[in-house]
């Protein structure tokens, strides 16, 4: 059983942040605030959400993109992180799994996900 004070604090943290509705298979653009010395800048990371796990303030999601020289890059982000400037849903994917780890083995056209029809 969780402590009611910790739960109340986590709920207060979650209420302050608005997160769009997205699932695994969606293509996202994440704007990350990066602090270098005394300067801060915003860097975009665009890729497919391959997993979402956890609940409450500890919930995380994994984004995968294909970088330079066809190297796959995956990053794990906490949904309610202060370093996330914004989360934008670019495309909705039509999938039937909650975890898309099989995309790690696929290359090129085989790694595509169909778009969800409205």
From Swiss-Prot:
Keywords: Ribonucleoprotein, Ribosomal protein. GO terms for biological process: translation. One of its GO terms (cellular component) is cytosolic large ribosomal subunit. One of its GO terms (molecular function) is structural constituent of ribosome. Gene3D superfamilies: 2.30.30.790. NCBIfam families: rplS_bact. PANTHER family: LARGE RIBOSOMAL SUBUNIT PROTEIN BL19M (PTHR15680:SF9), RIBOSOMAL PROTEIN L19 (PTHR15680). Belongs to the bacterial ribosomal protein bL19 family. This protein is located at the 30S-50S ribosomal subunit interface and may play a role in the structure and function of the aminoacyl-tRNA binding site. This is Large ribosomal subunit protein bL19. It comes from Campylobacter fetus subsp. fetus (strain 82-40).
């Amino acid at each position: 059983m969780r402590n009611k004070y910790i739960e109340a604090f986590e709920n207060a943290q979650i209420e302050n942040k608005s997160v769009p509705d997205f699932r695994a298979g969606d293509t996202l653009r994440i704007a990350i605030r990066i602090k270098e010395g005394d300067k801060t800048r915003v860097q975009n990371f665009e890729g497919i959400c391959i997993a979402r796990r956890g609940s409450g303030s500890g919930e995380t999601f994994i984004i995968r993109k294909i970088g330079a020289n066809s190297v796959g890059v995956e990053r794990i982000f906490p949904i309610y992180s202060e370093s996330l400037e914004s989360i934008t849903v670019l495309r909705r994917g039509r999938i039937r799994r909650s975890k898309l780890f099989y995309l790690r083995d696929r290359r090129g056209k085989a790694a595509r996900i169909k778009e969800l029809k409205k």
